[in-house]
Amino acid sequence: MASNGHFSSVGDVDGGNYQHGVQVVDGDKEFNPNLSKYLAHENVTPAGFNYHLISVFGSQSTGKSTLLNTLFKTDFSVMSETERRQTTKGIWLSKNKRTASNEKEKMADNVLVMDVEGTDGRERGEDQDFERKSALFALATSEVLIVNIWEHQVGLYQGANMGLLKTVFEVNLQLFLKDTKSTPRSLLFFVIRDFVGTTPLENLRNTLMQDLQRIWMSLSKPEGTENSTIEDYFDFEFAGLPHKSFQPEKFASEVDKLSTRFRDGHRDPSSTSAKGTAVEGGVFLPEYHRRIPADGFAVYAEGIWDQIVNNKDLDLPTQQELLAQFRCDEIAREVLILFDETIGPFEVQQAEGVRSGIPLILGSLGVAMRAARGKTMTSFETEASRYHKRVFMTKKSELEEKIDTRLKALFSGQLSAAHKSGVTQFSEAVSAAVKAGQKKGASYDFAEIVTRERKLAIEKFENEASTTMVEGAPWSDYKQELSLFQKDLEKISSQLRKDEMRRLATRVERWVRSRLGDSIDLEFNALGSGRGGSRAPENGDKPSEKTIWDRIWSLFVNTVLDAERRFTERARSFDASLEEVDVGLWRLRRKSWGVLRSKIEEEMMEGNILHKLRENFEDKFRYDDVGVPRIWRPTDDIEGIYTTARESTLSLIPLLARFRLNETSAPPPLDKWVGHMPSSASAADEEDLAPIGGVDEDDGKSLEEEMTMLSEAKRQDLTVRFKKAADGVYVEAKRSAIGGITQVPLYFYGLLLALGWNEIIAVLRNPIYFIFLLLIGVGAYVTFRLNLWGPMINMAEAASRQAVEEGKRRLREFLESSDSGRQAMAMSGRNARGTEEYEMSSNLKSKGRRTDTSDDDNDDDL
């Protein structure tokens, strides 16, 4: 197989062929941008730190890819048995595919295997640049470096890849120069191929270790590491595999046994084993891991390769800068872990508060921010200041910027929460104080409440902001936020004042409605009292019907003037401006006219006004000038009295049809009384106001139309209906007068005496009849003298009515107990429903027209 054609190689547009792996770097040193897609495809990206990377080194055509395919069940390209030439070009990566039936044979999760181009190939010749760069890349990313050599190469320099290992050691000193406790270690795993067993594996190990020690001693070590040993940086493992072709079964068995070693391991801190020696269990020790999260590995690897490839002065970056970059980044990550432990919970709480929409002020945030920032920067400076000065300063600035970015976000969020919370609490506190003042029934100073609560809110905001500040941070200033907070408080104060003004206007309007309702009721109830009667006042002059509109207008104006005085006095305590008061008074006058208009329309409803006219007529027809009820006699001028009373009542209809003052015979000056809209009024101030004819030009109604209470059609209909009602009263009076003239003829008494003489003599001669007749006569005389005939007649009528009702009830119960009876009752009910509704409406006229005049007790305390 010539190349890894079934892998996703560098240059693939979609990079979708991920079944077997991906080419990380091609032969021309180009990095594959699809590496992250492959890791996502293999579900490695969400693994965090739960992954492991293995690289394999060795001479070209020594079976490296074959070893990986057999050991990890990968599908790297291998050399054809019929020809010997390069198969692996660049660096390839694949995920371990080996599975196991039990936990003892199972490998670690997410093992990534990197197949590196072989060394000492004829294709590159003496060009060792790629060899050195690939070694640097593998060492910077891998935990375990597998060195694939043949048994007969042990003891050789080039054949045993000692030149490559020297490069690895040099690169390691450049990358991982650290103190002992934090030095990342790597594992060099020597796999000796075609192991026959004649030479014990331990002897081969000793030979290789001696060669490695000599190479290490020959290196030019950085200051401070002159006396270091190779075991300070590397651990070593050795394994031998039989010949694949000559001993295939044993080869497969040893490979299976070898696969069980690639699992997570743990080094016992109390162990006395020498450094550099293998440990029992898995080969993946925590100190081998490069601590790069899986989701950032692709970016990390690309950045490492970019640094390696673009170094034009040396094959590898200079010691100091590369080491400084690595160490500073590592130290920054370490100190940020502690920083996250302190600040992270606050960030989570603040984010949760933002998502919930509830402003959350974090307690002790300022203390935690100051402590975390100071401790983080101090720890970084202590650990990283000994490295390259320029890199250190750059990394310090980056770390400080990163920390300050997060702290600034927390600081801004805290101020934002304090801002929102302060505004909400200010609004609630003012509203609560106002409600408390209303409940007590006493007057309260709204302006004083607002001033007091605003001062408390600003003090609380400044306290929260000052305790959250971080000294020395350029962003730790809250003057602008304080100014915005004060502006918002002013807006809220203005809005609360407007709301309170609206509530005041509503209370005043309700007060006006209550006062006008009672007064207008009295005026309309007094219709007809000019001639006395049931509606006449007990004392004082009787009002004239012609001046009813004058009295109503006077009552209306005086009531509204009193309401304006109350409104103005209360508005002063709100610290309202003159413009706001003018707008409020203008709205009050318009609203009050609407209340009066509505009340008059209620009184002028067809049922109500007809009832009033009938009462007026009956007062004039049934009562004399001094209010004494008339008892009709045949000699009375019933027609004349009826005509006079009817015409007098009919004259009220045109009077009530239009709102006109008797003094001027013209409508009241409503337009002048309401006045023009103040210049400070907004569209919102007039959107809930009903248009008024003669005042609002856009309404299209004149003042005359606004003052029309009854249309011509309603007047005519009302006249007709009233005349019918008056005719009924007249007929009733006429009938009662005619019924009183019936007399018994005189001859009837002579006839009665002649025909009843025998019965009279029989009664007079019989003592029992005579005594009974005498008792009846005495009883009748006494009843007459005591004026008891009326009560006795009433009692008799009541008893008869009760007897009739009882009979009806018994009859109804009887009918309801039979089907035919229920059907008859249903038909009778439908026929009588119209009559009953008319009677009910007639009986409830005066009650149905009443409006709810009950107001809050606070209305009188405006």
Curated annotation (Swiss-Prot):
Subcellular location, principal: endoplasmic reticulum
Does this entry carry the keyword Transmembrane helix? Answer: yes
- Cystine pairings recorded for this chain: none
EC number(s) for this protein?
Answer: 3.6.5.-
Residues on Lumenal side: 765-767
- Residues that, per the record, bind GTP: 58-65
Q: Which residues form a coiled coil?
A: 476-500
Q: Where is the GB1/RHD3-type G domain?
A: 48-301
> Which parts of the chain does the record assign to the membrane side Cytoplasmic?
1-743, 789-862
Function of this protein? Cooperates with the reticulon proteins and tubule-shaping DP1 family proteins to generate and maintain the structure of the tubular endoplasmic reticulum network. Has GTPase activity, which is required for its function in ER organization.
Spell out the protein name for this chain.
Protein SEY1
The record lists the organism as: Arthroderma otae (strain ATCC MYA-4605 / CBS 113480)
